């Protein structure tokens, strides 16, 4: 019996289309799930979670590690999205940290996880780029994600901390796994070291650190770009919303700029 190749191609295409739609539907549901707070949803306009997670190829049956989830902005999306078929590691601040802000953030995050069954399967691990680097079992993760954290490691630990962070991500990922990095983008014509405490990082610098750890750059995206942001502000990135460190001073100006210009980079661990 002969099978028509055209019919087979149509069936295959239909199957792939259905699978894609199913993934999109699952993510859409995660974006409007009951655990998301109104204030966090309002920031979707700047953080573009759907487009960002799709760019990083995050799927509901994957093992995903999020680095320093903070108060849980992305946890509200990832925990329910991965709960049924996947696994979600939240690599938070270490319990033995001496930094009071980190202590409070970790406590509040743990309390948040107890507030809803959507978070019941979240696995908390610990991360500090120089002292706590076991974010997940080696070669176990399909995806590692870090949102607006790289500048902190560079500010507080220099290049050694930044490169160490990328090495820990590399260790946790399966061969072929994806690392997604988003951070505040410093223009390439500015001096990185002179503006170290601005909260901005050059995209070229982030790429260099990742390559030194063994990653391959697969793609970049303008999903989270903001051309209105010059990255030159009196209080660094915290001059802009949502921080607005200058209070009422020039508030309208900074609100008009919006949240920071951000690079979005997708790296892959070679197979």
What is each model feature region?
Residues 91, 176-184:
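Conserved beta-strand signature within the Rossmann-like core of class I S-adenosyl-L-methionine
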Residues 61, 84-85, 173-179:
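Short glycine-dipeptide loop
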Residues 27-59:
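Class I SAM-dependent methyltransferase Rossmann-like catalytic core
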Residues 62, 133-145:
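A short acidic, Gly/Pro-enriched loop at the edge of an enzyme's catalytic core
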Residues 213, 250-271:
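C-terminal lobe and adjacent flexible extensions of AdoMet/dcAdoMet transferase-like proteins
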Residues 103-133:
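S-adenosyl-L-methionine
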Residues 79, 160-175:
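A short glycine-rich, Lys/Arg-flanked "PGG" loop and its adjoining helix->strand segment in the class I
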Residues 60-70:
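Conserved class I S-adenosyl-L-methionine
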């Amino acid at each position: 019996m002969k099978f028509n190749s055209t019919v087979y191609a149509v069936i295959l295409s239909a199957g792939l289309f259905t699978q894609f739609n199913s993934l999109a539907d699952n993510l859409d549901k995660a974006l409007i799930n009951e655990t998301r707070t109104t204030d966090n949803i309002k920031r979707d306009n700047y953080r573009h979670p759907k487009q960002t997670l799709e760019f990083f190829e995050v799927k509901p049956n994957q093992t995903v590690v999020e680095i320093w989830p903070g108060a849980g902005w992305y946890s509200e999306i990832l925990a329910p999205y991965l709960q049924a078929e996947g696994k979600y590691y939240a690599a938070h601040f270490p319990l033995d940290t001496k930094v009071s802000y980190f202590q409070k953030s970790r406590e509040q995050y743990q309390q948040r996880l107890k507030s809803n069954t959507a978070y019941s399967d979240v696995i908390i691990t610990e991360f500090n780029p120089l002292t706590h680097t076991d974010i997940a079992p080696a070669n176990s993760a399909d995806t590692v994600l870090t949102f607006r954290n790289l500048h902190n490691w560079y500010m507080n630990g220099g290049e050694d901390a930044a490169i160490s962070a990328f090495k820990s991500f590399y260790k946790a990922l399966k061969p072929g796994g994806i690392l997604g990095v988003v951070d505040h983008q410093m223009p390439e014509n500015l001096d990185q070291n002179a503006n170290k405490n601005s909260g901005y990082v050059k995209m070229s610098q982030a790429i260099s650190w990742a390559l030194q750890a063994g990653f391959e750059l697969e793609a970049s995206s303008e999903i989270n770009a903001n051309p209105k942001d010059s990255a030159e502000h009196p209080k660094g990135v915290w001059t802009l919303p949502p921080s607005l460190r200058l209070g009422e001073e020039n508030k309208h100006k900074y609100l008009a700029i919006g949240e920071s210009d951000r690079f979005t980079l997708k790296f892959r661990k070679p197979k």
